[in-house]
Regions:
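Short amphipathic alpha-helical interaction segments
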Residues: 484-495
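Short acidic, hydrophobic short linear motifs in intrinsically disordered regions
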Residues: 470-481
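Glycine-centered, phosphate/nucleic-acid-interacting loop/turn motifs that mediate DNA/RNA or nucleotide
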Residues: 500
Length: 524
């Protein structure tokens, strides 16, 4: 195979054949202009291997790819870095878009609910990036109540098939695009009639829900407690009909109380809003149980950030590198899911959630090192047989404390009655509540602020700069006059410059791009 020898991913190459990689490289115009020792095809598989071995450096990952190949030369790490830069993120994104999509057959347990394929939107905000100037300029820094996060984090929105945890699509946002419904709107074209979208309260926006309906898909969303929906008609299962804007919906209001084997009890009230209007075909109690499937997307994210990455920070120090790395990671994840679902569906009646992601990943790693089954026609293969040999027991209902070991996290100390250890749930009591009928919307009351909101930091900075708008202002000088920590302000000045609000005239000096034309104070 010569220079193409390292262009493989072990047995997973069957799901990402070299012909597909070459075609994507040609379409994205990233095929090498002349044949080198490191052709573009090899670069694609090398990037996927970087995601498979996140704790290893470039040279060690190359050694994994060539361990089963006699006489393969190791290039320098600089040559491998140059290969990454030459490829860019475009071919990896295109590859992900090719392999992304639903994997489960409608007959496979857990894939569909009464003929509707269940999918879910959610955001992943815990993939850490190196703390470099370029990454901070793109991603910003998250400010918690007790300080800044140690690393910038990627903002990833995903659409997942809950039955198999396969990815249907993903979108990436920066510091100026952290809103989950806005990111999810970029993925709405992936929805189809025959899909049921499960959503948490962050997506309870009438405009966003109307957009979902326009795709032909149905939805089941947990509504915010601040909503005051009309109760237009009571239904026999305890739910009721209502409207959101011009959208006809059905609402289930239920109290859930879970009792653990240790006697602990945890409860919460749920307001579920759906476009499944037939209460005979989709009774309220059934929808309440179905909403739990939304958490399958959290399990998918767990596999990404912990099983694959094992908590490691990503490698890249700038936006193109991070995007390239992310698309490679998502592609690798999808290939593993393809192998797992292929294996599970050879045993009819087996739920895909019984397949061990850890088993699939570790077996795939072994196959990369051995360089085996690259061109085998056996799709079940070593990975599939390992998955079937280690099927997990059917899931049992459990709960535990929601706690994150991070002093700046809002989940550091939770006092919601959940037990400290994972506890089996013995009973789940569901009480459906039906509110009183209403025919007119509740009157809106105007809330007058007793005192105006304090000026934002950006407004204070711009106000000060506008006192002398024609001279460059030093960032440290601004911080001193406004009594702001210098390192915090300098980071924000760089971000405002990227957004076009300021111009950097020299090192550490800035001018406001829109000096005032009236006495009206600037707004943010």
């Amino acid at each position: 195979m010569g220079v193409f020898a390292a262009g493989h991913l072990g047995e997973l190459t069957q799901y990402l054949p070299v012909e597909l990689v070459d075609d994507v490289l040609e379409q994205t115009k990233t095929t090498q202009r002349r044949l080198r020792e490191l052709p573009s095809r090899v670069g694609v598989y090398f990037l996927l291997a970087l995601g498979m071995f996140p704790r290893l450096g470039y040279a060690r990952v190359w050694d994994k790819l060539t361990a089963g190949l006699a006489g393969a030369r190791r290039p320098s790490e600089k040559a491998l870095r140059d290969l990454r830069r030459r490829l860019g993120p475009a071919p990896l994104k295109a590859l992900f878009e090719v392999v992304a999509g639903p994997l489960g057959q409608p007959r496979t347990p857990g894939v569909c609910h009464r003929g509707l394929r269940t999918v879910a939107f959610d955001g992943l905000h815990s993939l850490k990036a190196p703390d470099t100037r370029r990454n901070r300029a793109w991603l910003g820094r998250i400010h918690y109540r007790m300080g800044f996060a140690g690393y910038p984090t990627l903002q990833v929105m995903a659409l997942v098939e809950t039955g198999t945890r396969a990815l249907l699509g993903a979108a990436v946002g920066g510091a100026d695009n952290r809103d989950e419904p806005t990111l999810a709107a970029d993925l709405l074209d992936l929805l189809r009639p025959g899909m049921l979208v499960l959503l948490d309260r962050a997506f309870d926006s009438t405009a966003f829900l109307e957009q979902i309906t326009q795709t032909g898909a149905r939805f089941l969303v947990r509504g915010k407690s601040t909503r005051k929906p009309l109760v237009l008609r009571h239904l026999s299962d305890g739910s009721y009909l209502s409207v959101l804007g011009g959208l006809k919906v059905r609402i289930v209001e239920a109290d859930l109380v879970m009792t653990g084997a240790d006697g602990s009890r945890v409860g919460d009230r749920y307001r579920l809003i759906t476009t499944l209007l037939d209460h005979h075909r989709h009774p309220a109690g059934e929808l309440t149980a179905l909403y739990h499937e939304r958490w399958e997307i959290e399990t998918a994210f767990l596999a990404l950030r912990h099983t694959i990455l094992n908590g490691h920070v990503l490698r890249s120090g700038d936006q193109p590198g991070l995007e390239q790395e992310l698309w490679a990671l998502l592609t690798l994840y999808q290939l593993l899911r393809m192998a797992m679902v292929t294996a599970v569906e050879t045993q009819p009646g087996t739920n895909p959630d019984r397949a061990s992601f850890t088993t699939a990943l570790e077996t795939a790693r072994d196959q990369v090192t051995a360089a085996r089954n690259i061109h085998s026609a056996d799709l079940l293969g070593v990975i599939g047989r390992a998955v079937l040999a280690t099927l997990l027991s059917p899931r049992r209902p459990r709960f535990s404390a929601r706690k994150v070991k991070c002093p700046t996290s809002r989940y550091l100390n939770r006092d919601d009655g959940r037990p400290a250890r994972t506890t089996t749930i013995t009973t789940i009591d569901v009480a459906i509540h039906t509110p009183t009928l209403t025919t007119t919307p509740p009157p809106r009351t105007r809330h007058h602020r007793a005192t105006p909101l304090p000026a934002t930091r950006r407004a204070r900075v711009i106000d000060l700069m506008n006192t002398d708008p024609h001279r460059p202002w030093n960032g440290t000088e601004l911080a001193r006059q406004l009594d702001i920590p210098p390192h915090n302000l300098l980071t924000q000045l760089a971000e405002w410059t990227r957004l076009g609000l300021l111009t950097k005239t020299s090192k550490g000096h800035y001018t406001h791009n829109h000096p005032p034309t009236s006495t009206t104070p600037p707004t943010t």
